[in-house]
Design a protein with these regions (language model features):
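Boundary at the C-terminal end of the N-terminal hydrophobic targeting segment
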Residues: 25-27
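Contiguous beta-strand segments within globular domains
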Residues: 33-44, 50-57, 213-217
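Non-catalytic cap/lid and distal C-terminal segments of serine-dependent acyl enzymes
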Residues: 63-104, 109-587
Length: 587
């Protein structure tokens, strides 16, 4: 008994000594980290900007100078460092310190930065006040024609990158001057085939308390001027902010173009492939026998993202109504569109895929078919890897004893490259209150109710991932497309019959195929009516597979404007009402 007793006593004593030594060691590490932790003092001169600023001040550190640090932050394993904090009424000549209080990614804060050589840069993503029609004022980053890209936004201030040395056990204090301003973006130029239009939206201007301009790039059919009596069907290509109408050129690839490598597709000379595909589109578009359509790409950026998701929302306003009832009729009036629901079709991939399905669902009589590629989650039971109704946390699987991170990005072999937490942590560094301009924040800006402060309510806590079930319920009732379709099938089904064409790769990088499986389970079981559409999968295909079983994503992503035309023409043949104009545009 005595022998048995001695060992526990000895182990207890050793344990106490071990805990004490660990505490001492941790304190020593914390002390050294505090001594080594860099601080950065940021300022700008009045000759750069003479008005006090609100916004998000970003500090960027990179271990190499292959590009400026502002272009090296992402969720890949190669990402460099970013730290962000809010500034208010920051005046020229005054100094602001970025220290441990700044939110970091992928490191938590500046105290985790290790000694070494870095290239440092600072950038101010400027905000402005919006006095909303409900009486609330919000401070947000306005789009400046760049599609909510903080590192390229005209008017944002930034510093010239500087090489620094962070030393161990030294006072690492650095001063940075925001000495550059991102210049304005030149507007695209009209050509014979492509026109660029803008219009003031009455609906959105009322919501935002100031003028809101919508835009579109319009690809006109061959023979538009020579056939003044022709009226045309419309194809709406939904997607991210387009600087111009993409993938169309009237000349062969530039013979002097230096081939560039695409890391995404592991292809050398992908820029030449893009130019060839764009020229091929022109040749088909202008060739004999090709259906004469108007095709458009829409510009509808918001202060939250590069596009509005094309639906009405509490925090962004009535974009769905503005696009469907203001912009599209305006385009059809300007360019002789037929202007009837049977003659309008919509398509797109990823964000554009969700938008195509959403506008077809919410405005079923205004469109005659949606071609929905790799859509953002169309069933929130598969919000990527989260069931927002049954799961309790967006970052970790529910487990009593384990901490199992939810994946956020994979390759076609299933290798995980980023977690849900990683992606959201980057957003937290870029901005709070949904102001990062990134993916999860725009989903909340679109799907969530507005909070009392005027900003979107969080689906989950940005730090912990804990899901707010009240917000999840709001998402389900208003934006879960498959929940809405199932709920309203008796009345909605007849209006969607034959109109839904859904495509996804079964190894989509963002697990978006999971929601498509759930959609298929319901749609294939429908009756009175049977949905009568298409659901197809690409074997081992990543994001964003769009239904092409013959070519890789690298090629098929460049062919949206032609690949669905056979099915569109068949749909018109089947569904055009008696007396519809089926001839003036067939020349």
């Amino acid at each position: 008994m005595l022998i048995k007793l001695r060992y526990p006593l000895s182990l207890c004593f050793i344990g106490l000594l071990f805990e004490a030594s660990l505490s001492y060691a941790q304190a020593a590490l914390d002390s050294r980290a505090a001594e080594t932790m860099p601080t950065f003092t940021i300022s700008f001169d009045s000759d750069i900007l003479d008005v006090a600023q609100d916004g998000r001040l970003l500090l960027l550190l990179a271990t190499h100078d292959e590009q400026e640090p502002r272009f090296l932050v992402n969720t890949s394993a190669q990402t460099q460092l970013i730290f962000g904090l809010n500034v208010q009424k920051w005046a020229a000549g005054s100094e602001l310190a970025i220290d441990k209080n700044a939110v970091g990614f992928p490191l938590k804060d500046l105290s985790a930065v290790t000694p070494g050589t870095y290239y440092v840069q600072a950038l101010l993503n400027r905000y402005k006040d919006y006095n909303l029609s409900n009486g609330i004022t919000v401070s947000l980053p306005p789009d400046q024609g760049e599609g909510q890209r903080w590192n390229r936004k005209p008017g944002n201030l930034y510093s010239t990158p500087v090489k620094i040395e962070i030393k161990e056990n030294a006072a690492n204090n650095f001063s940075i001057s925001l000495d550059q301003v991102i210049p304005e973006i030149e507007a695209p130029i009209d050509s014979k085939y492509i026109k660029h239009i803008t219009m003031r939206s009455e609906l959105l201007s009322e919501f935002w308390g100031e003028d809101v301009i919508l835009g579109a790039h319009v690809l006109l059919p061959e023979g538009f001027d020579e056939n003044p009596d022709a009226q045309y069907p419309l194809m709406v290509f939904h997607g991210h902010f387009p600087a111009d109408f993409g993938g169309f050129r009237t000349t062969p690839p530039d013979p002097t173009l230096e081939p560039s490598y695409s890391a995404r597709f592991d292809l050398e000379g992908y820029n030449i492939i893009e130019q060839q595909e764009a020229y091929d589109l022109y040749q088909a578009w202008s060739g004999e026998g090709f259906p004469r359509f108007i095709a458009i790409e829409i510009q509808h950026p918001t202060p939250y993202y590069d596009d509005s998701y094309a639906v009405n929302s509490a925090s962004q306003g009535p974009y769905g109504d503005a696009l469907t009832y203001e912009l599209i009729p305006y385009i059809e009036e300007q360019f002789r569109g037929i202007g009837e629901g049977w003659s309008r079709f919509t398509y797109g991939g990823s964000t554009g895929g969700w938008e195509a399905m959403a506008v077809q669902t919410f405005y079923p009589d205004e469109y005659n078919g949606a071609f929905i590629a790799c859509p953002d989650p169309i069933d929130f039971r598969a919000y990527l890897t989260v069931n927002i109704y049954d799961d309790s946390n967006g970052y970790f699987y529910d487990s009593q004893f384990q901490t199992l991170p939810r994946p956020g990005h994979r390759d076609y072999l299933g290798n995980v490259h980023a977690s849900q937490y990683d992606v959201n942590r980057l957003e937290a560094a870029l901005g709070d209150k949904g102001r990062s301009g990134q993916q999860y924040d725009i989903w909340e800006a679109t799907f969530s109710p507005m909070g009392d402060d005027g900003y979107p309510q969080r689906l989950w806590d940005k730090e912990t991932g804990v899901i707010d079930k009240n917000v999840a319920q709001y998402w389900r009732d208003n934006y879960d497309l498959m929940h809405i379709i199932k709920r309203d099938w008796a009345t909605l089904g007849p209006k969607l019959e034959g109109k839904l064409h859904i495509y996804a790769g079964d190894m989509d990088n963002y697990y978006l195929n999971n929601a498509v499986y759930l959609a298929e389970d319901f749609l294939e079981g429908t009756s009175n009516p049977y949905y009568g559409g298409v659901i197809e999968y690409g074997d081992r295909a990543e994001h964003c597979w769009n239904g092409d079983h013959e070519n890789s994503n690298a090629i098929s992503r460049l062919r949206y404007n032609t690949m669905y035309l056979p099915r569109i023409m068949e749909r018109i043949k089947q569904s055009a009402p008696e007396g519809a104009d089926l001839t003036s545009w067939r020349y």
